[in-house]
Curated annotation (Swiss-Prot):
PROSITE patterns: TYR_PHOSPHATASE_1, TYR_PHOSPHATASE_2, TYR_PHOSPHATASE_DUAL. GO terms for cellular component: cytoplasm; membrane; nucleus. Substrate binds at R110. This is Probable protein tyrosine phosphatase type IVA B. PANTHER family: TYROSINE SPECIFIC PROTEIN PHOSPHATASE AND DUAL SPECIFICITY PROTEIN PHOSPHATASE. CDD domains: PTP-IVa (cd14500).
């Protein structure tokens, strides 16, 4: 493991999903992350950054590309694709809680932002989602992203789950 990286992985759970948030894998850390995905029955990884590693090294895991600019908020089409990935993963897992891996470069901006969106869709209030994620992953989510989340409206009726 790279000792300079302080946020290796964080697990956050909602009623329908378990999220594994992590830094971008490197040649040295891919074996660790492959093992982590296997131990958590994770067959979906969402990558929010540019391609910097060989995705084929994660055999048996589907890599979804949801890239958007670091420090920014996701465009509407990225949010829609994120929610569709979560819905599909839930269905493929027989409507049982399913595990989704998600990463950007440091795992502190884009990654926790998308997880907050999922938590809001799952019925959590926006600032509750931010506080919950930050309680698990220190320094996550910047001020413009928090402003975006405060104004974010779940696509479903209040209290409905991602499904």
């Amino acid at each position: 493991m790279d000792p300079g990286r302080s946020h290796i992985e964080t697990i956050i759970e909602s009623s329908t999903h378990k999220f594994i948030l992590f830094d971008e894998p490197t040649e040295e850390t891919i074996p660790y992350f492959k093992d982590l995905m296997k131990k958590n029955s994770c067959i979906n990884i969402v990558r929010c950054c540019e391609i910097n590693y060989d995705a084929s090294l994660f055999e048996g895991v589907k890599i979804h590309e949801l890239c958007f600019k670091d420090g920014n908020v996701p465009p509407k089409d990225i949010i829609e694709r994120w929610l569709e990935i979560l819905k599909q993963a839930f269905i493929e897992n027989g409507k049982q809680k399913t595990t989704v891996g998600i990463h950007c470069i440091a795992g502190l901006g884009r990654t926790p932002l998308l997880v907050c969106i999922a938590l809001i869709e799952d019925g959590m209030k926006p600032l509750q989602a931010v506080e919950f994620v930050r309680s698990k992953r220190k320094n996550a989510i910047n001020s413009p992203q928090i402003k975006f989340l405060k104004e974010y409206k779940a696509s479903k009726k209040a209290g409905c789950k991602i499904m």
